Every structure is written in structure tokens, then in C-alpha cells.
Amino acid sequence: MPELTEVGARRGHTVNDEAFLHPSFGSGPDLASHGTGFYTKDDFIDILKYAKDRHIAVIPEIETPGHARAAVAAMTARYNRLMKEGRKGDAEKYLLYHPQDTSKYRSVQRWYRNVIDVALPSTYTFLEKVTDEIRDMYKEADATLATIHFGGDEVPRGVWAGSPAVHALMKENGRVKTMDDLWYYFYGNINSMLKKKGLYLYGWEEIGMRNTRLDGRPHILPNPDFAGENIQVDVWNNVIGWGAEDLPYRLANAGYKVILSPVSNMYFDLAYQKAFDEPGYYWGGYLDIDKPFYFIPFDYYKNSTEDINGNTVTSQYFKGKERLTDYGKENIPGIQGLLWSETLKSPQQMEYMLLPKLLALAERAWVQNPAWATEKDSVKAALLYTKNWSQFLNVVGKREMPRLDYYAGGFHYRVPSVGASTINGNVVANIQFPGLAIRYTTDGKEPTVNSNLYTTPIPRKGPVHFKAFNSNGRGGKSVIINSIKAQ
């Protein structure tokens, strides 16, 4: 299947996807740009060996049936090539999209023809071929493969409606009566294929959900067909304000293995704060180190204080939401921090978005429940949390950040901006992490590591520029405050 790399892995300006794909993130017309590329077999085996030596498990993801634009285009190009050669049987062997499909849809990213046709037998031939190739690479690397993630997210409405293969399947298979049934048909087939190979199915929350209606309105519930099948799901949608805040707990209570992956607390590609010069997305809110730190895996309602728009929420907001049962707790193997890299163009950008938030994730994943997480008295819980939070910030700022400055060549973690205000005509400043140095200037110039060190309030009329610096002299973003001297 050479088209997977010759077509699917190349990006450039084109009016169709026959030779390569149009770029999603502005990598430009040049095929030699950063938008083009792939890992070779040897590359992937090296990654597996490197990870194994460091006790890291690499879980591959084959995005299906959505987010498959490259695979669909590649196998369509293969089909066209072999049909021109008169090899109809070979051409159809790995086809992922019916040539006469008239379905009309757009993905969230505004793409068309990016969804695999789940009614084509060739779809399963292709996916089994890819699965077997992946297994072989794990064997060659002497690495363990227990599961493969088969996606399941962001499949738009309207897919398959115009597929001749789908309409034929509905006539032949009495269990496939609606478009929703195609979903269960597809993942049922994938689950069976993986079980025969000694693997279990892993995917996004959508693979464990069933669409139905309640009082005439659309309603989603955990799919009982797959519960108890040892299927594992990443559940991202606990967005406070969207209505599905209890979805992770509902799936765990129903028997699914749930990896808590909440966008509200663990999506590290979200911007640290609402500021024009802060990189990152904001569709799921803003995410600084406090949100993964105060996340309580088995009772995250308790410490949720704001909705997606930053509005205050109280415990009353979660009244009526399903809580996690003791049985459900047994179905949560862990929590996960997620960093989507499509807009990150350098290792430094990746490290900036990842650190220091990753330290808070480790605190919640590897440390037993803190006292404030289980304290029933809300006043006592708040006091315990404040004390623990202060201790954590001191440890990060005074011990962990200096380590990160030099460990493995140093990491480009985010140095936070200085907080500044005026009180009685004096300029006062503070910093999120004790241990970082606050430098300032009053001449309008950008602070450097040699500028004045802030230690006490500054009696000042006019602008003051502040910047924080770490132990090796790397600074964060500067801030300016204009003060008016008290009369």
C-alpha cells in the first residue's frame, strides 16, 4: 500500500487529494515543508525500544471511522491506479470509500471524505492488515502490545447516508436498521477482530455510547451491548456547562474501563490564561497548573468551581448528576493528560504547554487522595486545600523548576507572568511560584536578569515593567503596570 506514504503523508496546495493532501495548518504549497512526512518502520521500532527501556508503554491509535482523510485519500488513489491497470479485485481489496457515495457532510475541521465507509468489507481487510503490521513491529521491538486505540471521535452527521454499500448492508442485515446501528456494527466487528488476536479495544468515549430518545428528545446512554467486554475508553467530555459533566462516571458505573481525560482539567493544549499573547486553544476553557492539581478523580464535582466560561459554580450545580459507585471506581485504571500537537512547531513549544502542568497531573495520578479531597466539612476542606496548594507551589518553584532547568539538557517550561497591582500609590508584585526572581525597570526598558530585584513595594508614579526569571536566567512574559502616586 505505497499510497499511504506517497499520497497520505504528503501536504501541498492541490485542487484534489489524488497526489497529496491540502494542508490543514498552513504548511504551504511546498511538499518539502513540515506538513509532509512519516515515520518509517525502523523509526517506529526504535521508538518502541526507546520507550521500553524507560518503562513506557506506547499505545498506537488508528483513527476510525472519522479523522481518516489521509487513509481514505490514499486508498482511493490506490484504487484508481489499479483500476487503470485492469486489476479490479486488487483495487477493491483495501478500498475505504465507495466510489458512488453521494453523502454530504463536513467534519468539525470542515473536511469532506474524511470518514471510512463501515459497510465495505474492504474496510475490515484494511484495518486487519494495518493491525497485523503493527503487531509485527511490536514483536520485532520485543515490546508488549495489549491494545490498539481505534478512535471514534468527531464523526459528523450525514456520513454514509449516500453510500450504496450502506444501503445494501441495511437490506441484508436485520440488525442494521438506522445510521446509528452502523456505529455498533462497526465497533462490534473491530472488537471481535481484536479479541481473536488477544487484544482489547480502546477508543474515545463515543465507542461506548448509544444514541436513543427520552421524552421525544435525543438522549445518550452507555451502550449495554459492549459493557463488560473489557473495552477501554478515554472520556474527555466533562465540560462544565455542557450538560454531560457526569459522563465519565456513567460509563464507569456501566462497566466500561474509563481513563479520565477531562478537557476541563487535563487538556494541556488549552491556553494557560485568557491573554492575547498566550498560545493555545480556549474552546474547553483555560488551564493552568491549578486545574489538574485540584482534580479529584473519584469526585471531581467537589472541587469544580467554574464553568467553561469562567462563571462560578457551586455544589448545587451538580445536583442530580450521577456519582461514581464503588463498582465504578474499580473500572477507572487511571487519569490522563493530553497534549494535541497540531499547532506546536517546536520541542520548546511542546514543553511550554506541558510543563509545569504535568507535575500537577503526576501529583493526582501517583499520590494518594489528599485530606482535602475526602474532608466532609467544606470549611476544613478549603483550609486543607489552601495549605496543600501552597506547599505544592513552593516545591515546584524552589525544587522542581531548578531541576527542570538542567535535567536532560533542560526543559523550556512556562515561566509565569508577574502579578502586579497598586496599593496606596505603591506598586506591589507577586509570582505564582516562590523561588522565581522578579525583576523590574522604571525606565521603560524590558527587564533583564540584571535589572532591579523586586523585594518590597515600589513607591512609584508612572509605568513599571516586571518580568520573572528562573535559575538559569530565562524569563517569562513581561507585564507593565501604570501607577499613580497617592496625594
Where are these regions (language model features)?
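Aromatic/hydrophobic pocket-lining residues that form π-stacking "cages" and hydrophobic walls in ligand
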Residues: 47, 58, 190
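Active-site neighborhood of glycoside hydrolase catalytic domains
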Residues: 107-232, 237-243, 248-250, 254-255
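An acidic- and aromatic-residue-enriched active-site/binding cleft used to recognize and process polar
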Residues: 1, 9, 56, 61-69, ...
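Soluble non-cytosolic domains of exported or imported proteins
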Residues: 38, 42, 117-121, 125, ...
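Flexible, acidic glycine-rich loops studded with aromatic residues
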Residues: 200-425
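Short, compositionally stereotyped local motifs that mark structural "simplifiers"
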Residues: 379-487
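Structured core elements
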Residues: 57-61, 115-117, 149-151, 202-203, ...
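Aromatic- and acidic-residue-enriched carbohydrate-binding clefts of CAZyme catalytic domains
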Residues: 1-53, 70-119, 158-178
